[in-house]
Every structure is written in structure tokens, then in C-alpha cells.
Amino acid sequence: MQNELIELAIALVVLALIMVVLRRASLRSQHKAKATAKERLEEPGKVVEVKPAEKPAEEAEEVVEKPDAETAAAYRAGLARTRGGFVARMGKLFGKKQIDAATVDELEEVLFTADIGPRAADRIFQAVKSGLSKTDLESSDKIWAQIKKTSRDILSVDAPPVDTSKKPFVLLVLGVNGVGKTTTIGKLASLWKAQGKKILLTAGDTFRAAATEQLEEWAKRAEVDIVKGKPQGDPSSVIFDAIKKGVDESYDLVICDTAGRLHSNAGLMDELKKVRRVADKAMAGAPHETWMVLDATTGQNAIAQAKTFKADMEITGIVLTKLDGSSKGGVVLGICDELKVPVRYIGLGEKIGDLRPFDPSAFVEELFDEAGSSEAA
């Protein structure tokens, strides 16, 4: 019995010692864990090198082909009045010491009161207001550059080269009275005759007094042939005869004048449609081009005229006359923006050589030339 008690006591002592050892081991483990956690908290985070975001590649600078000196001079002289109008007003705005939000608002007013059409005006204004940063808006150079770029975009109407390889190439010329239609035909005849073309004019405006005589005078000056009809006669028959003559006698171009009553005259539209049908009977596919002559001095009314004609007729080109005598030359922008019809020629003076193929780059450069923007209106 005594031995059993002794063994029990020894077992209890051993058990107590084991518990003490385990307790100490547990305390050491907790202490170590706390120390490790503390070290982790106090350990400075690794510095991760963050590379600055790469700046987006700058947009390629627009390459604008400069016109030759002679062309630039002609455009500059012909656009003097327009440059002295709304462009000069813009020049005064951007000439301020500080360009601010109020200046941009004034630009909107200038554009919308210019004869460039509301669509083109809004397109240019939004390109400046929304297309430039706040910093850029403080730079007159950046504003001018944006105005020029947007104007070039507006004028970038698809304009395939005139294909005169068809023999004869038949050109139908439209326009209301007084826009310079007959004079334009005479100048075109002179220009193409100088290129060695065999030209035949067609006096298809049989209703206007002296229209045939005027075209006949141009035929003499250009030394080209003409087909005439009877006064008040059927324009379609005159044009039919002319095209047949052009085919039979191997002419290069047949240029057809047409009646030019007011664009609101429904009877005129019917007559012009008949002319087109008859032309196609005389030569399949004729007319190959139909150009409309507009007077720049009429401003936005020119756009209205063209819209009315275009609603009933296929217009493939515009000739804009009298730019040199008008402050409304910016109407070219409205014509291209709203009609999507290419401007083929512009009139920059009275001489035959002043009727020039339209060069959008030369037009924009000489119209929005900062050096000339302060010219007197």
C-alpha cells in the first residue's frame, strides 16, 4: 500500500513537471510569434519603382502642300475683301493680350454672322472650343492652326479629276441669271482651247435676250465654234444638234449653256431635266459633267440656289464667280459642307486667266492669313 502511494506521488510530480515544460514552451512560442509580427509591421515596405506612364505619341503634324508663289499671289489678291471682313474680325479677337472664355464666345458670334453657312460655322467653332486644351486656347497660333485644319477638312470633298477622254466630253452648265454663267463658259472655252482642245459651244439659253449674242462674242474671242438656235426656241433641240455635231466632227469638248431663270421657277427645272434626257439620246452617257455657276457676292443665297438645283438635278461641280468683288468668299466652306459637291473653279478677277482651278490649300492659307487679318474691312 505504501509503495503504491509512493508511485502515485512520483507520477504526479512527473506530470506536474511535464505541464511546466509545456507551459514554458507555449509562452516562448507566443512570444516569438509576437516578435515576428512586430518585426513584420516595423519592416519598411519594399520600394517598387513605378515608371511614369509613357506619353502618347504626338499626332503627326499635318503636312500641307504650299501653293506656288504665283497661285498664292492670285488667291491672296482675289480674297482680299473676304480677308478684310470676318477674318479681320477674328484677327482682332486673337490679337488681344489675353485670350479668355469671352474671346471664344465672341469667335462664335463672328463665325455665325459670316456668310459661311451655319453648319460650317458651328463645325469650326466646335473644333476650336472642344478640340483644343485650355492652354492651347490661350495661344492665337494654336487657334489659327485649328481653324485652318478644320476648314481644309470641310473643303476636302471628293473631287475626282475631270475625265475629258470621252470624245466629245459634254459639259452642261447651269446657273440663275446674273451669276456670270455665260462668261464662265467663255473663259472655260479659252482655257481649254489653250490646251489644244477642239471646243464647241452651245447657245442653249434661248430665252434670255442677248444670251446667244454674248456667247457668240466669247466664241469669237476664244476662236472656237458655236451652235445657235432660234430666239425663244427649244433649248433641247439646240443641245441635241450640238452634241451630234460634236460626235460627227470629232470635237474634244461640247460646252452647253442653259436657261437661267430664277431657281424658284419650277418650269425651268422641268426644262433642264428635258435637256439632260435629250443629251443622253444624242450621245449615251451625256452630259458627262453638270456644273453650277454661283455668285460669291450673294453669300448664303448661293447655297440656297445650289440646294434647290441639286434637289432636281445631278450637280457634279461648282464654279464660284466674283470672289474678288465680295467679302463673302467664305461661302465656299458652306457650299462644300452642305452640298458635298466639289468646287471646280473660282473667279478671282475679270481676266480669262483669273478663272482658276480651285485649290483648297491655297484658299485656306490665303484666306486665314494672320498677317493680312488686320486689313481694313
Model-identified regions with their sequence ranges:
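Non-catalytic terminal/linker segments enriched in charged/polar, low-complexity residues
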Residues: 1-153, 166-167, 194, 373-377
